[in-house]
UniProtKB/Swiss-Prot annotation:
Name of the protein in its database record: Tryptophan synthase beta chain
Record GO terms (molecular function): tryptophan synthase activity
Catalytic activity: (1S,2R)-1-C-(indol-3-yl)glycerol 3-phosphate + L-serine = D-glyceraldehyde 3-phosphate + L-tryptophan + H2O
PTM-bearing positions, type N6-(pyridoxal phosphate)lysine: K91
Gene: trpB
Keywords of the record: Amino-acid biosynthesis, Aromatic amino acid biosynthesis, Lyase, Pyridoxal phosphate, Tryptophan biosynthesis
Length: 407
C-alpha cells in the first residue's frame, strides 16, 4: 500500500484540513512555507540530528523486556525507551524540531500548551537552549496535578499561565494558546505538542516524532535478525508518540498497529477519553477529527487518570488509520493502567508514565493472545517520576476503601 498522506490541503483521507479564522490562516501558511523550505535544506536536518544525538541522547534503546515477557508467557515484548530521552519523554523530539524551525523563521517568542506538563517542560527546555522567550498555557486542573512539572518549567525560564476557562484541562490550554498566537503572530511561534491542530501541524509533529519508528525498525532488525515485528502498541491521547512509532511501518501491512486509548472509569460511563471508541467526526482546534461530543455537537469533557491523555479529540491521521482499518484503537481503564504501572515497575525495574502504562496494560493482554512465537514493539513514551505521588495517593485511597468495605 503506497501511503502519501496528507494531500496538499492537509487532509488524511477525509480528516484533517485547516479550519481556522483568517487571522490565523496567514500564520499557518507562513509556517507551511518555512517547513517545506527546511525539509529541502540538508543543513536543517543535519543540525537537528546533531542536537538529537548530543543533547537529547538519541538513539533511544529498543529493550527486550525479558522479565515481562516471561511473566506473561506470551509474545516477546520490546520496549522503545523514549523515557530515556532528555526531559523524560518523547515530547522533546518535536519541541526541539519546532523551536529550531521557529528560530530559522526569525521568531522571538515561543508559546505552547501542555497537559501532563511533559510537552511544556520539553518546550521550555528547547526555548532555553535557543535563548527564546517562552510562555506555557496549562489548565488549572493540570497545574494542580502536575506541580512538579510546573516548577520545572519555571526553573527553565518559562512563564506558566494557568487557564481557568472550561474544564481547566488540556483542550482549554490549547484554546488559550491559539488565542495568544492570534494576538502575537508576528514575533511568536506556537508549538503544538501533539499531532493535531490545523495543517501543517499534524504533519510537522508526525515527521519530528517519526524518529521513534525509524530507529525502532532498524533496531528490531539488528536485535532479532528478523525483518519486522508482528505488532506495535502505543498510548494515544492526541497521538504523537503513537504516530511517531506507527508512521514508518504504515506500508508494512503484516504489522498490526494498536493505539491504547484512555477509558478512564469505563467507556460506558461519562468519565473517559476514548475518542475512537466513542467519538464521531467533528472540528476541534482547527482540524476535522474524531471528537467526543454530545447529540448537539458540544464537545464533551474528557477524563483520565493521566493528564496527558484527557483530550476529547485525536490527531487526524489516527482518525484516518482507524477509518481505513490500518490501526485498531482499544480502550484501557484507569484501573488497568495502574496495574500496568505497577507491573512494569515490579518486574523490569522501569517506572513508566501513566500515559505509557495504558500501552503496557494493553500489551500484556495482546501478548497472551498472540502467543510466544510472535513479537511486538511497545512505545514507552515517558518515565513515571511525575506520576509517583499521584499513584501513591490513589493506591492508598483504594486500600483505605477496601479496608472500610471489609470492616
Amino acid at each position: 500500500m503506497a501511503y502519501q498522506e496528507p494531500n496538499k490541503d492537509g487532509f488524511y483521507g477525509k480528516f484533517g484540513g485547516r479550519f481556522v479564522p483568517e487571522t490565523l490562516m496567514t500564520a499557518v501558511l507562513e509556517l507551511e512555507k518555512a517547513y517545506r523550505e527546511s525539509q529541502a535544506d540538508p543543513s536543517f536536518q543535519e543540525e537537528l540530528n546533531q542536537l538529537l544525538r548530543q543533547y537529547v541522547g538519541r538513539e533511544t534503546p529498543l529493550y527486550y523486556a525479558k522479565n515481562l515477557t516471561q511473566h506473561i508467557g506470551g509474545a516477546k515484548i520490546y520496549l522503545k525507551r523514549e523515557d530515556l530521552n532528555h526531559t523524560g519523554a518523547h515530547k522533546i523530539n518535536n519541541a526541539l524540531g519546532q523551536v529550531w524551525l521557529a528560530k530559522r523563521m526569525g521568531k522571538k517568542k515561543i508559546i505552547a500548551e501542555t497537559g501532563a506538563g511533559q510537552h511544556g517542560v520539553a518546550t521550555a527546555t528547547a526555548a532555553a537552549l535557543f535563548n527564546m522567550e517562552c510562555t506555557i498555557y496549562m489548565g488549572e486542573e493540570d497545574v494542580k496535578r502536575q506541580a512538579l512539572n510546573v516548577f520545572r518549567m519555571e526553573l527553565l525560564g518559562a512563564k506558566v499561565e494557568a487557564v481557568t476557562d472550561g474544564s481547566r484541562v488540556l483542550k482549554d490550554a490549547v484554546n488559550a494558546a491559539l488565542r495568544s498566537w492570534v494576538a502575537n503572530i508576528d514575533d511568536t511561534h506556537y508549538i503544538l505538542g501533539s499531532a493535531l491542530g490545523p495543517h501543517p501541524f499534524p504533519e510537522i509533529v508526525r515527521d519530528f516524532q517519526s524518529v521513534i519508528g525509524r530507529e525502532a525498525k532498524q533496531q528490531y532488525r539488528d536485535l532479532t535478525g528478523q525483518n519486522l515485528p508482528d505488532a506495535l502498541v502505543a498510548c494515544v491521547g492526541g497521538g504523537s508518540n503513537a504516530i511517531g512509532l506507527f508512521h514508518p511501518f504504515v506500508e508494512d501491512e503484516s504489522v498490526a498497529m494498536y493505539g491504547a486509548e484512555a477509558a478512564g472509569l469505563g467507556v460506558d460511563t461519562e468519565h473517559h477519553a476514548a475518542t475512537l471508541t466513542k467519538g464521531r467526526p467533528g472540528v476541534l482546534h482547527g482540524s476535522l477529527m474524531d471528537v467526543l461530543q454530545d447529540a448537539h455537537g458540544q464537545i464533551l469533557e474528557a477524563f483520565s487518570i493521566s493528564a496527558g491523555l484527557d483530550y476529547p479529540g485525536i490527531g487526524p491521521e489516527h482518525s484516518h488509520y482507524h477509518d481505513i482499518k490500518r490501526a485498531s484503537y482499544v480502550p484501557v481503564t484507569d484501573e488497568e493502567a495502574l496495574e500496568g504501572f505497577q507491573l512494569l515497575s515490579r518486574v523490569e525495574g522501569i517506572i513508566p508514565a501513566l500515559e505509557s502504562s495504558h500501552a503496557i496494560a494493553f500489551a500484556v493482554k495482546l501478548a497472551k493472545e498472540l502467543g510466544p512465537e510472535k513479537s511486538m514493539i511497545v512505545c514507552l513514551s515517558g518515565r513515571g517520576d511525575k506520576d509517583v505521588v499521584q499513584v501513591k495517593d490513589r493506591l492508598e485511597a483504594d486500600a483505605a476503601k477496601k479496608g472500610e468495605a471489609h470492616a
